[in-house]
């Protein structure tokens, strides 16, 4: 959300929202038409007018707009996969496909591939290539009281499955992930099968870290995670390797232009058409996106290039505008509205795009909630160069989470963690014993750029010297977090940053 908003409401909005057509318009213009999700093929406008005619330009601009909005999350997902598994010389490279990479550390400001990262749980990542055969995810026993999860994300950014504390418990287990063409039975010794709509699946591992010395136990748990191909479980012959792929280079400037359509074309070859997307996939064929062969935007006529770029740029503008609209679904939008499986998110691709723009790979609401603070109690944008802020939890009214909660600081411009002398990027429930209590037993946190002084640093969450936002994460939330019985406290601005 980024435009006219009820600023007070924005304090509750989650850390991910980007584009939305005007809801409820009786006859919306082309730019605010019904969600591009998957219009029926019969109703779709497929460019058919003669080359370079005004009608064709109009049709192509509309297609460029719709294609950008429908494909945005898909292409954003590729950005992370390219960094993690393709660009071997890049700083974020983690290893080949089907190879688990676990880091026994938490995110810092030096990590730049994923915006709005969680720094409570050391991560593990594996991108599964399921073209040749399914992959088996094995997990060890995890002690009671420690949260862990494996989040399964397809190429659309749908969360289509979970393994972990909430869903399968902390016992050891083996879970098979299959691609869209796999038809085999459930193998013996497998606890559950997760079927993906796409051949490439990102699995995000999160393992709770209680405190710095606890990192050794996290390492032991991570060492118990494994990924193995199905043929090793069944002791059968290995299948033939899948064809080598010519992965397109990810370059931010290129993707801002027609390179976006080249990457989308590459990805759709790996994503079988599902009924919900038949309409938009048929329309994209008119410009060669998703058709056999490699798309080369240089083969477009000048008129077609101009029209597609105009539509794409309208889509970019719309995303930027809608990323600050807190009510684009007809009610106050939270992160719980933005992440989930296909059935939950439905045909409205605005939801997955908003999530991908401001915090890709967010959890489904049952797994975690992400209220975000972007404004203070008076509705003013947060800016630590202008004010200091306090956040008070009354006695007995800490965030209700069965696993844990955390409050993390982010730079308002980069959407990354904030460098600071204490190397403190968050305050969470495992730190409660070290926090100073108010006289009545409540807890008041201070969010500001300058240190409030040694005596007050225990409750200080350092902010950048400028715009910022803070995300409150509740892992495995209690019902009170859903039903409204727990109220999210507001950030209160104090006139000047506190001086040491």
Please state what every model-predicted region is.
Residues 24-27:
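Bacterial signal peptide processing site
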Residues 1-7:
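N-terminal secretory signal peptides that target proteins for export/translocation
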